[in-house]
A protein has these predicted regions:
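Glycine-rich phosphate-binding loop and adjacent beta-alpha segment
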Residues: 206, 224, 259-321, 355-360
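Local beta-strand N-terminus motif with an aromatic residue
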Residues: 93, 182, 228, 249-250
Length: 360
């Protein structure tokens, strides 16, 4: 079992900082300030980061590709400190959002926008999983010409914090779901990813949006911030969807909860020939009861986020069309991140998302 703790790093000290603080899953690791390793790298001084449910999956050993001893964290914004010789898209001093995906931009999959499947050895989800991530004071970003986006001057760090991961996931999910204006869209799960997905679905103006969650506090959040959205709980879901759809079920279902029962719930509430987009990351296998599903002719879409639209979402934030700041319910200093993890994992005090300030 890996030990989950906070460590002070040794070596490669920043002249103004006697130690570099990170949060790691470690066995006998030593953390140091990030240094350039490639001409397309950049070093970012992290100003604000966040804890993602995926970090909890790593903590509990549910992500086999995660490297023991890695500094976790893949939701972050910061300031460019140093760039490799091939980087011209950003420069030291630029405020940037960091993409959860590492991608080369030139392989077959990147050229088609499927950056999660980048064929580079470091491609896909690397930061905070296979290489050191951003719950730290500094992070090295490979392929920084692809993975960093400048934050507009009028956009705060808090507004941009989720651009590289959870908001990118919601935007990607909404885009691939082929939502039309006459559609009834069902979103299962009102956690952080579900709420970001909801914001991006709203941009497409479907006829109805239904959000289902087991947590009344999260449904209250939806009712407060998005009063036009219909809400329900799992025990009422089937009848509620039938009463609020035109063709015997939802036209599009986005499964963002990832529990033992929500996958079945998703396809059962879909009308025949509907699209079911599986956004959630499951801890275990799911049953695919093909005899029960036969005849519904459903289209399933699933997989890791192709997060290559961060510049677009930053523009939407700048224009006031997306605002994820209400999701930040708690803020902690990096030195207090163990407490932040405790609050986030046990869902205390109405927590939705936590912002971690690296600077003291």
């Amino acid at each position: 079992m890996h030990e989950w703790t906070q460590k002070r790093a040794i070596g490669h000290f920043h002249p103004l900082r006697p130690a570099i603080k990170t949060i790691v899953i470690h066995q006998s690791s030593v953390c140091a300030r990030s240094v350039l390793q490639h001409e397309r790298d950049a070093i970012v001084r992290v100003t604000l980061s966040s804890i993602c449910t995926s970090d909890l999956h790593i903590k509990h050993g549910s992500v086999p590709r995660a490297v023991p001893g890695i500094t976790v964290g893949h939701e972050m914004v910061g300031v460019v400190e140093e760039v490799g010789s091939a980087i011209t898209s950003v420069k030291p001093g630029d405020r940037v959002a960091v993409n959860v995906e590492t991608f080369c931009g030139s392989c077959f999959f990147c050229q088609h926008g499927w950056v999660n499947n980048c064929t580079d050895p470091n491609g896909g989800w690397a930061l905070g999983c296979r290489i050191d991530g951003g719950q730290a004071e500094y992070v090295r970003v490979p392929y920084a010409d692809q993975g960093l986006d400048k934050i507009p001057d009028s956009v705060t760090d808090e507004q941009a914090l989720f651009v590289g991961d959870v908001l990118a996931t919601g935007y990607w999910a909404a885009q691939i779901s082929e939502i039309k204006e006459d559609d009834t869209v069902l979103i299962i799960g009102a956690g952080p990813t579900g709420l970001c997905t909801l914001q991006c679905v709203r941009l497409l103006h479907p006829k109805r949006i239904i959000v289902c969650d087991i947590d009344e506090a999260r449904l209250d959040f939806v009712r407060l911030h998005y009063p036009e959205v219909l809400t329900t709980t799992p025990d009422c879901l089937t009848d509620f969807v039938l009463a609020n759809s035109d063709h015997g079920g939802a036209d599009v279902v986005l499964e963002v909860a990832g529990s033992k029962t929500t996958f079945r719930m998703a396809w059962e509430c879909a009308r025949p020939n509907a699209i079911v987009t599986v956004v959630a990351l499951y801890n275990g296998p799911q049953s695919l009861p093909l005899p029960d599903m036969y005849g519904k002719n459903l289209i399933f879409k699933t997989g890791g986020v192709d997060g290559c639209n961060c510049a677009e979402t930053l523009k939407l934030i700048e224009e006031g069309k997306i605002d994820t700041t209400p999701l930040i319910t708690h803020t902690y200093a990096l030195k207090d991140i163990e407490e932040a993890y405790r609050v986030f994992e046990t869902r205390l005090d109405g927590v939705i998302k936590i912002a971690i300030k690296s600077a003291e």
